[in-house]
From Swiss-Prot:
Location in or out of the cell: Cytoplasm
GO (cellular component) term, any one: cytoplasm
Active site: 13, 41
Entry keyword set: Cytoplasm, GTP-binding, Ligase, Magnesium, Metal-binding, Nucleotide-binding, Purine biosynthesis
Taxonomic lineage: Bacteria, Pseudomonadati, Myxococcota, Polyangia, Polyangiales
Metal-binding listed as a keyword: yes
Protein name per its UniProtKB record: Adenylosuccinate synthetase
BP term (GO), one: 'de novo' AMP biosynthetic process
GO molecular function: adenylosuccinate synthase activity; GTP binding; magnesium ion binding
């Protein structure tokens, strides 16, 4: 019985797709437990890129079965499009993809609410959402009026639930200048999608439990990142679900005693999409260089990501709230050739200097930066720590020392093979 959790340790976009794909070589079951189509995972295999927003990253591994658990919110149109894209790659989803009948349904007017709210919000209040309807869907869930994927089996019941949700959102839509779609139009859109999706529905908590009882290796794949967590992130500039490791138990329907290890993913620098505080942000040529070399553009929105120096207090914070016992450090190769290299080691706050991440004062806290040695030698061919330049090796060792957590994986390039694996999470 082995279950491991892979979670983002920053503001998302840490490279979960590649690392999850790496570990699915050893996994029997890959489970996505939170979020929705706002979280795009990019897989690069043989130089070809595939972006999945809903389906777990393990779908390209023929040995792995994939689960979309009840903590997710699902846009049925996006799901069907992804299934078609995966199948077009010659990768069958038949008997390999299972979707929780308890996951909530993103309805066609949820993205409309999201977009209109963002457009109407004033500067400083705008959250910078992906406008995919995630927040409004989770609002329906919390208000106990949402429709779930299992309701696609009964169109009469679905019509009642959609009608109730539409009635609740209509005043908001009209106040924001939008026109709500008709119930008939919504049902016409959902009916053909329901025929594609209902054969995939299952009690996924029971499915996961069965796999664990049989001694199978289960990988629980997070979405977004720790600093976007609804409770532990930089509120209110956060997502609508739990993005930390503890959310895996709730979102997947497994008890905490079933989790063996927690691996946190962190870039060798920091990025953030959308609004919100970002203390180590770089606005000039260095920030643009990180964005250009690192390909830092949102896989869902295409928006340029904000870039900045590695934030060690934030990484220590993520290690604490997730209980990390391993780190996967990604995009180390992007730092190659940087004319200068700095990291944040502490913060100056009104109450003094602290090595902790000042989550409640983050908008006004000032990062304390230290210069570290840079390197110019290409590292994408390295497959062991000894093959790295001394400065790159010391950078990895610094992360271990500052967080107290071993770096198990170092990504030195975009492709699957460009990876240094020091310890397998399933070992």
């Amino acid at each position: 019985m082995t279950a491991i959790v892979i979670v983002g340790a920053q503001w998302g976009d840490e490279g979960k797709g590649k690392v999850v794909d790496l570990y699915t070589e050893s996994a029997d079951l890959v489970v996505r437990y939170a979020g929705g189509p706002n979280a795009g995972h990019t897989l690069v295999v043989g130089g070809e890129k595939l972006i999945v927003r809903l389906i777990p990253s393990g779908i390209l591994r023929s040995n792995a079965r994939c689960v979309m658990a009840q903590g997710m919110v699902v846009d049925p149109g996006v799901l069907v499009s992804e299934i078609d894209a995966v199948e077009a790659r010659g990768c069958s989803t038949q008997g390999r993809l299972f979707v929780s009948d308890r996951a909530h349904l993103i309805l066609p007017f949820h993205p409309l609410v999201d977009s209109l709210r963002e457009a109407a919000a004033a500067d400083g209040v705008r959250l910078g959402t992906t406008k995919r309807g995630i927040g409004p869907c989770y609002e329906d869930k919390a208000s106990r009026r949402g429709a779930r994927l299992g309701d696609l089996r009964d169109m009469k019941r679905l019509a009642q639930l959609v009608s109730r949700s539409l009635e609740a959102w209509t005043p908001t839509l009209r106040a924001l200048g939008g026109e709500p779609p008709s119930l008939d139009a919504i049902l016409d859109e959902l009916t053909p999608l329901a025929k594609r999706i209902t054969p995939l529905l299952a009690d996924t908590s029971q499915l996961i439990d069965g796999a664990l009882r049989r001694g199978e290796r289960v990988l629980l794949e997070g979405a977004q990142g720790t600093l976007l967590d609804i409770d532990h992130g930089t509120f209110p500039f956060v997502t609508s679900s739990s993005a930390i490791a503890g959310g895996a138990c709730v979102g997947a329907g497994v008890g905490p005693t079933r989790i063996r290890r927690v691996l946190g993913l962190a870039k060798a620098y920091c990025t953030r999409v959308g609004e919100g505080p970002f203390p180590t942000e770089l606005d000039g040529p260095l920030g643009e260089r990180l964005r250009s070399v690192g390909g830092e553009y949102g896989s869902v929105t295409g928006r340029p990501r904000r870039t900045g120096w590695l934030d060690l207090p934030a990484l220590r914070y993520a290690a604490r709230v997730n209980g990390l016992d391993g780190i996967a450090l990604t995009k180390l190769d992007v730092l190659t050739g940087m004319p200068e290299l700095k990291v944040c080691v502490a913060y100056d706050t009104p109450s003094g200097r602290t090595r902790e991440f000042p989550i409640d004062d983050i908008a006004t806290a000032k990062p304390v930066l230290e210069t570290v040695a840079e390197w110019s030698e290409p590292i994408d061919a390295a497959r062991s720590m000894t093959e790295l330049p001394a400065a790159a090796r010391h950078y990895v060792e610094m992360v271990e020392k500052e967080t107290g957590v071993p770096v198990d994986v170092v990504s030195v390039g975009a492709d699957r093979e460009a990876t240094i694996v020091r310890r397998n999470a399933f070992a």
